[in-house]
Amino acid sequence: MADKKSPLIAVSVGEASGDLLGAHLIRAIRKRCPQARFTGIGGELMKAEGFESLYDQERLAVRGFVEVVRRLPEILRIRRGLVRDLLSLKPDVFVGIDAPDFNLGVAEKLKRSGIPTVHYVSPSVWAWRRERVGKIVHQVNRVLCLFPMEPQLYLDAGGRAEFVGHPMAQLMPLEDDRETARQTLGVDAGIPVFALLPGSRVSEIDYMAPVFFQTALLLLERYPAARFLLPAATEATKRRLAEVLQRPEFAGLPLTVIDRQSETVCRAADAVLVTSGTATLEVALCKRPMVISYKISPLTYAYVKRKIKVPHVGLPNILLGKEAVPELLQSEAKPEKLAAALADWYEHPDKVAALQQDFRALHLLLKKDTADLAARAVLEEAGC
């Protein structure tokens, strides 16, 4: 293992949201330990912070049971390779960020060899597969939780866990500023604007983008001056979006695909259509009304539905304990229903104002110095 003044910190992420968390974590660790070095699996944002990625993070960005099965041989090959590489490099600590099905297996093998392990972002054990808690406690030395209801589950099982807040709540301003967002993006102040967030993975684009674009066409019939904004999380998703938009049915759709900038896009919008996942929380922290949707393979959906233990799938609804925003999933994810739900938000500003009060309270609950708290915990495990 490295000199504690220049610790080697291994990090592994599976998708765009993890890449963002990883980049913030690296920055916060460097403030406390400027000579720290980083390796593992990371995306473009982490690489921009000087991270050395041993494998292509995009190859891990798959969703759904059926989709994972198709790619399982490659995913297992990458995991075996990462474990082999890290056992050779002997990092001072391993941090798995989200992607629990991949990262916890890596952590378990490294912990067994004496390498301290941290899992950053608790799996949704409060929602489904709660029996995993005991196994996670065995696999990692410490869990860093983004939501306040999570640590007690691990403490009750004899593990170590702490609530570090959510990094988006820390980084995003409490106050709303639609005018500045529209100026930044060059969008007229007086027209209807809808944001489309079909997902950060290519597999999500395949399922959701056609439905979202069909929804946009219906909204355009209702609001001819409307514009649509779509933030592309990665170059891979941007390429796939371009392919979908080339279909004749979407010709002339007034849609602008923007590199990343999802927060600015959401703030510029009157309402947002979003695929279920971390992005729903970002929309809530932007204080924007939304409609949550999701479509996966029927087999995956049947499996998930049997296992899930909470009445909602969207993070804002789960955290608020009520259906504050509509969820139109699977067979309900039809363009007609999605368009009607978005129009309902656009045409009822009184409902939007009440929702924004709920979202402000949620923002205050989750707001902590997340990156610094996480960095402190990681360096403590590394013995620094």
UniProtKB/Swiss-Prot annotation:
Pfam assignment, any one: LpxB
One function term, GO molecular function aspect: phospholipid binding
Catalytic reaction list: a lipid X + a UDP-2-N,3-O-bis[(3R)-3-hydroxyacyl]-alpha-D-glucosamine = a lipid A disaccharide + UDP + H(+)
GO cellular component: membrane
Pathway where it operates: Bacterial outer membrane biogenesis; LPS lipid A biosynthesis
Domain of life: Bacteria
Keyword entries, A-Z: Glycosyltransferase, Lipid A biosynthesis, Lipid biosynthesis, Lipid metabolism, Transferase
Protein EC: 2.4.1.182
InterPro entries for this protein: Glyco_trans_19
Any single biological process term in GO: lipid A biosynthetic process
Keyword Glycosyltransferase: yes
Keyword rRNA-binding: no
Family assignment from sequence similarity: Belongs to the LpxB family.
UniProt function note: Condensation of UDP-2,3-diacylglucosamine and 2,3-diacylglucosamine-1-phosphate to form lipid A disaccharide, a precursor of lipid A, a phosphorylated glycolipid that anchors the lipopolysaccharide to the outer membrane of the cell.
Record-given protein name: Lipid-A-disaccharide synthase
Organism of provenance: Neisseria meningitidis serogroup B (strain ATCC BAA-335 / MC58)
